[in-house]
Structure formats: C-alpha cells, structure tokens
Amino acid sequence: MTDFSPREIVSELDRFIVGQADAKRAVAIALRNRWRRLQLEGALREEVLPKNILMIGPTGVGKTEIARRLAKLANAPFLKVEATKFTEVGYVGRDVEQIIRDLVEVAIAQVREKKRKDVQARAQIAAEERVLDALVGPGSSPATRDSFRRKLRTGELNDKEIEIETQAGGGSPMFEIPGMPGGQIGAISIGDIFGKMGGRTKTRRLTVVDSHDILVNEEADKLLDNDQLVQEAINAVENNGIVFLDEIDKICVRDGRSGGEVSREGVQRDLLPLIEGTTVATKHGAVKTDHILFIASGAFHIAKPSDLLPELQGRLPIRVELNALSRDDMRRILTEPEASLIKQYVALLQTEGVTLEFGDDAIDALADVAVAVNSTVENIGARRLQTVMERVLDDISFGAPDRGGETIRIDADYVQKNVGDLAKNTDLSRFIL
C-alpha cells in the first residue's frame, strides 16, 4: 500500500492530468485513508469503513484517466470495470461477484511478482543450470559446463537455439457451465479441474535470450509457497482493494421508462451488498468486501445521479463533480502532461528522422478547433484533440519515410489549411472530426 501524502498523490496526478482539482483531492484523501486505517489497532480498524466516491462529469474530462494513474500509484490490488458488462443474477452474462474474483486474480499476480523478486537470485542460478542442460546435456563434465557458463554469462550464446521443457498452460474456456459465470461452482473453478488433469509440460524451441525470463519465472514459482501467496493476496484485497466502476450512469433506470430497464436495476441491487460489505466465494477462498474502496464514475448525460437506487446513492457518500474542459484546458492538455499529445507525435516522427516543431499559434489554433467542434457537434472533451491532431498531421505522417532529415514547423495557417474548413462546416465535421 502506498504511503504517499494526499499532496504528493495530487502532484503525481498533476503530471498527467490537467485541472479537476476536486476529483484529485477526493481520490487522494480516500487513498491516504486506506493507509491511516492500517495504522489503527484491532477493533477500531474493523469499524472504519471506506468512504466510497461518485465522480460525475462529461465524457473526456479525465475520470477514467484518474483511475488509470491511481492504479499505478496505489501499489494495491486495483481493478477497473465497466458497469455495463454485468447483468442481474439469472440473466445470461457476468454477475457482479465476478468483480471480486477478478480483483483476487489481480492481487495474486501482484504478490507473485513481488515474491519472485525475493527469490530472483536463486531462480537465476536454477534457470542457468537448465539452459546448460539444454546446451551440453545433464551428464556433461564440470569443465565443459564451466566453459559454457562463461560464454552464457558474456552473452556469446544469446542467439543459439535450445529446446526446453516448459509448463503447458492449463484450463480451457470450453469447460464453462451455462449460468455459472467463470465456470464457478461454489469455490471450485471447472477450468482449474481440467487444467490440473492436463497440466503437462511441453517442449519449446527458443533462443537462449528468449528462454531466460520464462525459465527464471518457472524456477521462482517453484520456490514460492503458493498457499501463503494466495492468503497474502486475499488479505491485500480485503484491506487495500480498490474497484473503479466506470459508466455507472448507463445502469440507471430513468423516470417513466420500463421494459429492458429491469436488468439494469437488478445490477444496481446486486451491487448493493458488494459495496456495503458481504462475503464472496472465489476458487481461492472466501473474500470479505467490507473494506474494499469503490470509486464509481459516469457522465450522467441523460440520467441523473438521483436516478440511481436510493440505497446505492447512500453507499457512495462522496460526490465529486468534474468540470467540462475550457479552451485554456485544451491548450494545457496539448503541452503540459509528461506524455502530452504533442510530445507523442514529435517522438513518433523523430523515429523517421523528421523533426516536428509546433508554434504557439498552432497550439492555440488546435485548441480553438477542438473547442469549436465540441460545441457544435458533440462534446467528447479531450478526446477531440486526438481526432484533430491526426487530421492535421495526416500528410506528414504518410510522407515521413521520404522526408528524413527535414524540420517541419506547424503554425496556425497549416492547422487552418487542414481542418479549418471542416470545423466550420458542421455537417462535414459530424462525420470527419
């Protein structure tokens, strides 16, 4: 679990996301409260429940990007899911308990990666012995092995092909039972049963350098205690797990509507116990959801937050509104983030030997076009900038291999020449921008 202060979390998010200070503060405080709770003792720790968050704002303003960046910062089991992927229990599709099962799998992968690092040195030695067995045979003399070991460590044998035995992937998707999402019966996965029956090794032909990571991971896994690993992962999910529920507005039941809305309301009802706190059976054991933090987000273009079930509204006590992007925000998005669009395009074309330069007037023109099209067609926020940039740089990207060594300067006139007319013609921009 990360021990960043709220101010440090916000400054990390500022490196990639423009504006939206309220949303950044809310998630920073929620993340810090996870750490604070773990410093408490016994009974009080159990009583402190997470304050779940509902983020409301139009599309393309940074809701999902905040989740993506938070996942990297959190150093905790984190899962982002779309609410529209799930159906009410009894309908064909995935039920919401699959969220927790998936979160457990994420946690196991995280813990395994961390523990592999602890046994890395021993795994490297064992993997090296397996490569030597493949090169000179298990019965070779110590002198021969030492000679090949030296060559192996200096990289002389990197391109040599060897045959190695690796673990065959288990579990086939064909063994799923209708109405049992993920092939789950209680806490047993059908896929796992068949995976164990067919858990054999297979021979693969690889170069020495390609086989290295595969063999090191296999040898590391042999040194790990799988039961302890799973227990640690479940503990991490129960105490530090974070679920980001995107598109929650799409499962709202709007006033005066009926028919296909039944399943939507059912999904909301199924989410209630999960967010409030329940026990979910997974193939690795029971998982309590009382202390998992849920962050829900939605554009709420058509539905309103009040269209959510009252019980669900009560379980998302912290409301954060994200603002629509202004012209100044668009301009900052093009230049300020560490991986801004302009930096990406400059780096991409640099690989062809083309140096791309953007004048301040070009950046202003790009922001103006994006804002104009958003206001006349459909407001899709910062995503409009990608469409505009692709259109402006279309000719340059196409001809870049023939223009190596050139320096191309983009100014306002160049932007207007490529997208100016389209931005003014609403009918055309509906289809092209």
Swiss-Prot record:
InterPro entries according to UniProt: AAA+_ATPase, ATP-dep_Clp_protease_ClpX, ATPase_AAA_core, Clp_ATPase_C, HslU, P-loop_NTPase
Gene that produces this protein: hslU
Biological role: ATPase subunit of a proteasome-like degradation complex; this subunit has chaperone activity. The binding of ATP and its subsequent hydrolysis by HslU are essential for unfolding of protein substrates subsequently hydrolyzed by HslV. HslU recognizes the N-terminal part of its protein substrates and unfolds these before they are guided to HslV for hydrolysis.
Principal subcellular localization: cytoplasm
Top-rank taxon, per record: Bacteria
One Pfam family hit: AAA
UniProt entry keywords in alphabetical sequence: ATP-binding, Chaperone, Cytoplasm, Nucleotide-binding, Stress response
Protein family: Belongs to the ClpX chaperone family. HslU subfamily.
GO biological process: protein unfolding; proteolysis involved in protein catabolic process
UniProt-listed SUPFAM superfamilies: P-loop containing nucleoside triphosphate hydrolases
Subunit: A double ring-shaped homohexamer of HslV is capped on each side by a ring-shaped HslU homohexamer. The assembly of the HslU/HslV complex is dependent on binding of ATP.
Cellular component GO terms held in the UniProt record: HslUV protease complex
Protein name: ATP-dependent protease ATPase subunit HslU
Example GO molecular function: peptidase activity
Intracellular or extracellular location(s): Cytoplasm
Record-listed ATP binding positions: 18, 60-65, 246, 311, 383
